[in-house]
Amino acid sequence: MPVAVLTLLVGALLFIGTYTATPYGSTATAQDVRASTLDKAAAATEEARVQLLASYEVTPGTYVDRGFLVDNVLHAGNLGDIHFSLLVPESYDVTRPASLFVTLPAEPGLYYQGAGANLQVEEFAFTAQGYDPNMIVVAPQPNDWTQTSANQVVELTEYLLLAYDIDPERVYLEGYSYGGETLSLVMDTKPQLYRAALHLASQWDGDVEALAAARIPLRISLGDNDEFYSVEAAQRVVGELRALYEAQGLSGEEIDRLVVLDVKPASYFWDPNEQHGGGSPRMARDPEVLGWLFAQ
């Protein structure tokens, strides 16, 4: 979180405190005092949010593709420009917090492969809408799957939490292939931003300690003979996570909820000889995979 976030929110809390001692007439009830304090607290918090939001610079997207405004750019200083496509449903209502789905691209959906390319080659951004028609969907387009890209995803998520009325308890993250590698680094950086994470046909590039400390549910799904990523590597990650949860004193049932390894047999895929490429649309349409994410 940028220093400005902390500064403004601390200022808002101090502002709130100045009103707890506001003198009231002798006829004022405790309920009156609390109501007035809460009103002023809300106003102070909103003012801080507006001021912080004004510190971000965003260039709007250039065209619309199936409801998504494509190639918005969040100018993020040292993190560079963050390109993303955004769907805000027509039903979005600022009085009713929305959920947020963040879908991270595989190749050939990275930004250097064309603005909006991820929307052309992956279905997750579209099939996810069937689980919650009021959900905001963002499809970032980093240029790679390194720590810089993970930091950009975190920054973009924090920006959207400020820009829209989003329920922070319903922010979901998914990544396929290279997108899964980026997801693993996001989970190593700031896992507490997300309700759950779906890691698909990929490998784990980050550490797992931060994820285990935050206890964010994780599902790893991949084919038993994926052409690029191994089941054995996924098993090692799951083993490390389970060991950390056991050290925390969690029960087997609790651990089973927090970490799921889902290895798909050849019969799951439309073409058993093309598990990696064919797995993306298959998993995007599978309620046991994508549906798991939104059930957390």
For the regions a protein language model found, what residue spans apply to each?
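Primarily recognizes the serine-hydrolase "nucleophile elbow" in alpha/beta-hydrolase
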Residues: E169-A212
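Short, proline-enriched alpha-helix->beta-strand connector loops that line the catalytic pocket
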Residues: D132-P133, A212-L218
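N-terminal Sec-pathway targeting helices
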Residues: M1-T7
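A domain-start/cap signature at the N-terminus of enzymes
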Residues: L13-A98, E181, V186, G249-D256
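Short alpha-helix in the alpha/beta-hydrolase fold that links the catalytic acid
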Residues: G116-A117, Y229-A247
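Gly/Ser-rich "nucleophile elbow"/oxyanion-hole loop immediately N-terminal to the catalytic nucleophile
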Residues: E90-R96, W145-S177
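Active-site machinery of serine-nucleophile hydrolases
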Residues: A98-L100, L104-V154
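C-terminal catalytic histidine-bearing segment of alpha/beta-hydrolase fold enzymes
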Residues: S221, E227, L244-Q296
